[in-house]
Amino acid sequence: MEVRYKPEELTKLPRSVEYKERTVYMINQRLLPREFKVEAFRTVESVAEAIKNMTVRGAPAIGAAAAFGLALYAETSKAKSKDEFMDGFYKAYETLKNTRPTAVNLFWALNRIKKLVEEHLEDPLDEIKSLIVNEAQKIADEDVEANLRMGHYGAEVLPEGNLLTHCNAGSLATVHLGTVGAVVRVMHKDGSLKLLWLDETRPVLQGARLSAWEYSYDGLNVKLIADNAAAFVMQQGLVDAIIVGADRIVANGDFANKIGTYMLAVLAREHGIPFFAVAPLSSIDMSLKSGKEIPIEERSPEEVLTCGGCRIAPDVPVYNPAFDVTPHKYVTGIITDKRVVWPPFKRNLKKLFGEQ
């Protein structure tokens, strides 16, 4: 596979998460599409709250945000000794770790920095601080590079024509470009993407608010549908492939993604439509054997009872899982930053990590 485009050739959007001068900068995704605003965060607690309340969202984006939270701690800590600094480091680590339970990138990024620090405990404190900041930036930069590779891998295997996607796995969900976002942007640049169908993605409307905004901003041909119209457009022969992101892929190929993904996978099988997941290696959790082991976040009932801040239902009990799990039997292929993985996933994912 040859990488033919640079990030700036594929999107006009800035990075969704950045760190400079002891400040984490993030696009506030809660305000879109009404307002585009980059907000500054200068404490670990404020970064953690931004992850929790979905100011920043998307597995790779929250992984980078958490890493930058540790960088922020390192550069603002007033600890006078290494022991005092490490006590504060572990507190910051736990604060960031306890924000959202499903996306594995969060834990992967935090544990990567924690492991590095613990390997260098004999180093001078200033060097440990620099290690943390540099590693956090490396995590963010690697995400952009991974997305670029996934974009080109995906463009090689997806059919020309109309794609359907769910939620937002675009630039906003990552540091830059996106997972699904990179694939559809490369295909758009190549001229092979004719139309991108966007599910609205209730209850938080990431498809309607975020995907519709960012893809139309970059000039892609998009069409928004209600979630319950997906089966009909498939039945009408208007979808050539389905492409979704993944917050956590496990060893057998099952994966967790935004609630409603499983439904699309079953519908794709019924209509003979290829169904692909796109995610970097950092989203693959080989420690879990099946999707039944993935913790599923349940969010506030208010997300279902309201829409755009307006009450749309009476005060009734609500079940609001943020994710569902798609069994691997429905998955045509998994597009990673190393290559496309095909069934049997249990064997081929193990082989993928054996190549590391």
From Swiss-Prot:
Molecular functions (GO terms): S-methyl-5-thioribose-1-phosphate isomerase activity
Positions of substrate binding: 57-59, 100, 206, 257-258
EC number: 5.3.1.23
Positions bearing the site annotation: Transition state stabilizer: 167
Taxonomic superkingdom: Archaea
Active site: 247 (proton donor)
Keywords for this protein: Amino-acid biosynthesis, Isomerase, Methionine biosynthesis
Reactions mediated catalytically: 5-(methylsulfanyl)-alpha-D-ribose 1-phosphate = 5-(methylsulfanyl)-D-ribulose 1-phosphate
Database matches in SUPFAM superfamilies: NagB/RpiA/CoA transferase-like
UniProt cross-references to Pfam families, sorted A to Z: IF-2B
GO biological process, one term: L-methionine salvage from methylthioadenosine
Described function: Catalyzes the interconversion of methylthioribose-1-phosphate (MTR-1-P) into methylthioribulose-1-phosphate (MTRu-1-P).
Family: Belongs to the eIF-2B alpha/beta/delta subunits family. MtnA subfamily.
Stated name of the protein: Putative methylthioribose-1-phosphate isomerase
Top-level taxonomy: Archaea, Methanobacteriati, Methanobacteriota, Thermococci, Thermococcales
